[in-house]
C-alpha cells in the first residue's frame, strides 16, 4: 500500500494540509497516511524541529505531504533548533536535490496579480532549483577575524559558494527532461560574468545540452532574469538555476500569479521520491482564523500523484477540480476580486471535493 507521511508543521500548516488530505481521500485511492510533528510542533513535542520518529517516517514513506514551518516565537532559539531546520534536514537526509516550483496564472486570477492582466494571463513557468549545494551548504562558513584586506583583523562573516560537476549535471538532466515534456525551451540562469562557480555551471549545462538537441537552451544572468520575469514573463518556459538564485527567483515568479497561496512545489530525489509542499510559509498571523488558501497544498498533492506515485490521471482530476472551483467564482481572501464569493479554508476544500 502506498504510504504518505503527512507533516502539517506550524501556523496554517495544520489547516491547509487537512484540506489536501480530505481531497486525497475523495479520489477513491487506498493510501496509508500517517501524521507526525515537524518544525515548531516537533520542537514542542520532542525538543527538536525534526524528531527522529518523524525522520524515520519520512524515510519509510513513498512520499511526504508537508505543510509549513516557522513562527516568530522560535526566533530566539539557537539556529539548529529553529523550525526552518526541519525542511533543510529533510532535504539533506532524503537527498532531495531537485525543486520544482511552477508559476501558473489562471485566467480567472489575472486580475488579482499586481501586474497588468495581459502580461500574466496564461503564464506557465516551471522553475527547477538545485536544492542541496551552493552557498547555503558550502563549507567553510562562519565568523572570524578577517585575515587580509582593508579591514584585516576586523570580524567578518563568510560563506562558500561551490558546485561539483555531478551536482550540476544531475539538475541539468532533470531540467532538460522537464523542458522536453513542455515547450522545449530551457533558460539556465547564472552569474557567470563575476562568479567562477557559475561559469563552471554554465559550461556543464552547455555540455549536457548535447544530449537534448530538441530543447532550445539559453543562458541569462540572474539580474537580467529578475528584470525579464517582470517585463516579459511569458517568454520563459522552464528555468534552471542554483540554490540561492532559485530561492529568490521562484518567489518573484510566484507573485506574478496573484497569490503565492496558489502555488505548489515538489522536491525530488534521484528516484522521484518527493516532498510536496505549498510555496508559501506558515503565516502565523492568520493561523487558526480559517481564512488561509489551501489550494497550493491541494495542488501539491496533485504534483505528488503525478511525479512520485505515478497517478497522472488522478493529478489531472484534482487540477481540473481547482480550475472548476475558480471558474465558479470561489475565492479565499488572498485572491478575492470584485464579483466573486469569498470563502474560508474549509469551504474552499469542500468546493474542490464537490468539483471532484
Curated annotation (Swiss-Prot):
InterPro entries: IsoCit/isopropylmalate_DH_CS, IsoPropMal-DH-like_dom, Isopropylmalate_DH. Keywords: Amino-acid biosynthesis, Branched-chain amino acid biosynthesis, Cytoplasm, Leucine biosynthesis, Magnesium, Manganese, Metal-binding, NAD, Oxidoreductase. GO terms for biological process: L-leucine biosynthetic process. Gene3D superfamilies: Isopropylmalate Dehydrogenase (3.40.718.10). Its EC number is 1.1.1.85. GO terms for molecular function: 3-isopropylmalate dehydrogenase activity; magnesium ion binding; NAD binding. Mg(2+) binds at residues 223, 247, 251. It is found in: Cytoplasm. This is 3-isopropylmalate dehydrogenase. It comes from Ralstonia nicotianae (strain ATCC BAA-1114 / GMI1000). The gene is leuB.
Amino acid at each position: 500500500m502506498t504510504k504518505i507521511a503527512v507533516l502539517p508543521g506550524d501556523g496554517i500548516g495544520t489547516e491547509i494540509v487537512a484540506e489536501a488530505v480530505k481531497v486525497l481521500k475523495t479520489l477513491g485511492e487506498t493510501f496509508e497516511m500517517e501524521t507526525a510533528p515537524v518544525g515548531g510542533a516537533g520542537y514542542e513535542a520532542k525538543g527538536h524541529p525534526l524528531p527522529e520518529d518523524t525522520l524515520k517516517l519520512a524515510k519509510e514513506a513513498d512520499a511526504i505531504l508537508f505543510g509549513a514551518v516557522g513562527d516568530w516565537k522560535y526566533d530566539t532559539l539557537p539556529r539548529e533548533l529553529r523550525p526552518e531546520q526541519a525542511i533543510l534536514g529533510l532535504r539533506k537526509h532524503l537527498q532531495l536535490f531537485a525543486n520544482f516550483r511552477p508559476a501558473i496564472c489562471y485566467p480567472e486570477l489575472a486580475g488579482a496579480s499586481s501586474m497588468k492582466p495581459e502580461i500574466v494571463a496564461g503564464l506557465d513557468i516551471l522553475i527547477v532549483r538545485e536544492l542541496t549545494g551552493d552557498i547555503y551548504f558550502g563549507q567553510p562558513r562562519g565568523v572570524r577575524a578577517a585575515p587580509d584586506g582593508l579591514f584585516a583583523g576586523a570580524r567578518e562573516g563568510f560563506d562558500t559558494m561551490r558546485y561539483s560537476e555531478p551536482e550540476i549535471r544531475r539538475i541539468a538532466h532533470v531540467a532538460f527532461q522537464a523542458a522536453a515534456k513542455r515547450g522545449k525551451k530551457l533558460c539556465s540562469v547564472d552569474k557567470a560574468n563575476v562568479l567562477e562557480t557559475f561559469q563552471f555551471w554554465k559550461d556543464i549545462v552547455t555540455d549536457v545540452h548535447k544530449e537534448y538537441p530538441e530543447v532550445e537552451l539559453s543562458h541569462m544572468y540572474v539580474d537580467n532574469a529578475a528584470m525579464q520575469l517582470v517585463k516579459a514573463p511569458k517568454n520563459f518556459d522552464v528555468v534552471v538555476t542554483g540554490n540561492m538564485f532559485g530561492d529568490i527567483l521562484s518567489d518573484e515568479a510566484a507573485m506574478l500569479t496573484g497569490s503565492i497561496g496558489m502555488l505548489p512545489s515538489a522536491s525530488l530525489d534521484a528516484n522521484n521520491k518527493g516532498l510536496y509542499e505549498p510555496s508559501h510559509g506558515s503565516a502565523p498571523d492568520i493561523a487558526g482564523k480559517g481564512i488561509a488558501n489551501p489550494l497550493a497544498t491541494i495542488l501539491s498533492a496533485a504534483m505528488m500523484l503525478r511525479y512520485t506515485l505515478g497517478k497522472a490521471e488522478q493529478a489531472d482530476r484534482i487540477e481540473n477540480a481547482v480550475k472548476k472551483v475558480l471558474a465558479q467564482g470561489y475565492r479565499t481572501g488572498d485572491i478575492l476580486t470584485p464579483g466573486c464569493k469569498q470563502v474560508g479554508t474549509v469551504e474552499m476544500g469542500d468546493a474542490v471535493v464537490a468539483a471532484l
